[in-house]
Amino acid sequence: MANIMIPSKRPRAPSFSEKHPKYVGSSDWLPAEKDKAQVQLTNFLELCRFCKKNLRHDEDVFMYGYLGAFCSKQCRAKQMACDVFRDFSRQKANVKKGRTSKDEGLDRISSSPSSSSSSSCFYI
């Protein structure tokens, strides 16, 4: 039996890179932010997010949250406790300010884990 190719009913739509060749691979906007994000992505398995010990590639790594790598279950549990405490404190502060839970969602979006915090939790 012969191999027969049946043409598609519709032609393929051009991709973004075909429509806009000058934008392909050029993310020059905010190069410092791009470099910071790239470092965070490449280094998140090198240090424990809580105690900052070097993580060994031949040992277990315990994960939690977005890019949260930990050397032990204890460090991971401590970070989880810090996160719960931080969220509880934020909710309590919002109640005092008369904010609603909808406003709290905006706070989470505007604050990032890398921003400075008065708690003893550490972020990379």
From Swiss-Prot:
Location (main, coarse): nucleus
Domain of life: Eukaryota
ZnF region ranges: FLZ-type: 43-87
Gene Ontology CC: nucleus
Keywords: Metal-binding, Nucleus, Zinc, Zinc-finger
Entry's Gene Ontology BP terms: response to starvation
Entry keyword DNA damage: no
Compartments in which it is found: Nucleus
Biased composition (Low complexity): 110-124
Induction notes from the record: Up-regulated in response to mild as well as prolonged energy depletion.
Region feature Disordered, mapped onto this chain: 1-20, 92-124
GO function terms (MF aspect): zinc ion binding
Family to which the UniProt record says this protein belongs: Belongs to the FLZ family.
Quaternary structure (record): Interacts with KIN10 and KIN11 via its FLZ-type zinc finger domain. Interacts with KINB3 via its N-terminal part.
Main function: May act as an adapter to facilitate the interaction of SnRK1 complex with effector proteins, conferring tissue- and stimulus-type specific differences in the SnRK1 regulation pathway.
Protein's recorded name: FCS-Like Zinc finger 16
Source organism: Arabidopsis thaliana
Gene: FLZ16
